[in-house]
A protein has these predicted regions:
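Conserved activation segment of eukaryotic-like protein kinases, specifically the C-terminal portion
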Residues: 161-176
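Activation segment signature within eukaryotic-like protein kinase domains
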Residues: 110-111
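Catalytic-loop of the protein kinase fold
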Residues: 122-138
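Conserved short submotifs of the Hanks-type protein kinase catalytic core
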Residues: 77-91, 95
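ATP-binding glycine-rich loop module of kinase domains
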Residues: 24-53
């Protein structure tokens, strides 16, 4: 970057008014900003060596309103900057903390909306790898998927047989993300299954008795338990092979195949209490 380019980028950067800082850490700074009376927007400043420019370029091409709409990208001397639309709402983690488990019809509606976002990402070659309650915003128009900090572009040409760095949120990350295999679309399918399970139970998937509690939970329809088991099979080949297949299983009237082996997690005891009715959550959605 020459001096002229740097000055131009800094003039763009200075045009934004910072409303408040949303997050700050080794991976960069996230701010709520406005410009010329427009906004608010989210602005992320990522250290240049950590910037996944190809992921953000792919996201810019996505059309789903369940994904952030990228407004601008530019380069500072030591930062890659992305500006995208801000979606007001509550995360699924916050909703579960406040209300507990969701009614099955509400959980299915939300997971299908998240599937729409993930399916669009996959069509543009992006694997999200961090589909969690904290990374789903529920706004007036439904669910939105956020946080692309560990997303990557799927590389069919790569010679690697497995991921070399363990990344993801424990309990929601697929086994591949811990070095068992190479992540692909089926890794996000695993996370979608875990997320559906969380919405239906209000229990984080790192409890020692998590799977047994799901199996014994009469409030969760047996067909949805089967869908979750299918999506969360340890072996990627035993899962739905795409988000589209997962959605088909979700709405099918017949039970999906049950894998011989499920995934397992070490202990934790994080739970939420209570049950949110469909009408209560739909007031959030509409």
């Amino acid at each position: 970057m020459d001096d002229k380019q740097a000055m131009h980028a800094m003039s763009i950067d200075d045009a934004y008014h910072v409303e408040r800082t949303l997050a700050r850490g080794p991976s960069g700074v996230t701010e709520l900003v406005s410009i010329d009376g427009n906004g608010p927007f989210v602005r992320k400043k990522i250290p240049s060596p950590l910037a996944q420019r190809n992921v953000w370029a792919a996201l810019s091409a996505c059309q789903s309103n369940r994904l952030p709409r990228v407004e601008a990208t530019y380069e500072l001397p030591d930062r890659f900057v992305i500006v995208y639309d801000y979606v007001p709402g509550s995360t699924l983690a916050q909703i579960a903390e406040e209300n507990g488990r969701l009614a099955p019809n509400v959980a299915v509606q939300l997971i299908d909306q998240i599937c729409e976002a993930v399916q669009e990402l996959h069509q543009h070659g992006v694997i999200h790898r961090d589909i969690t309650p904290a990374n789903v915003i529920v706004a007036q128009d439904g669910a939105h998927l956020i946080d692309f900090g560990i997303a990557r572009i799927r590389s069919e040409a790569s010679n690697r047989s497995r991921d070399t760095t363990a990344l993801g949120t424990y309990g929601f990350a697929s086994p591949e993300q811990y070095g068992f295999a190479k992540t692909d679309a089926r890794s996000d399918v695993f996370s979608l299954g875990r997320l559906l399970e969380f919405m239906l139970t209000g229990v984080y998937p790192d409890a020692s008795d998590y799977e047994q509690r799901l199996a014994d939970d009469a409030a969760v329809p047996a067909r949805l338990r089967a869908v979750i088991g299918y999506a969360c099979a340890f072996e990627p080949s035993k899962r739905p092979q795409s988000v589209q297949e997962f959605r088909q299983a979700l709405f099918s009237q017949s039970n999906p195949p049950i894998p011989n082996a499920s995934s397992a997690n070490p202990p934790s005891t994080r739970t939420t209490n209570g049950s949110a009715s469909a009408s209560r959550l739909f007031r959030r959605l509409h």
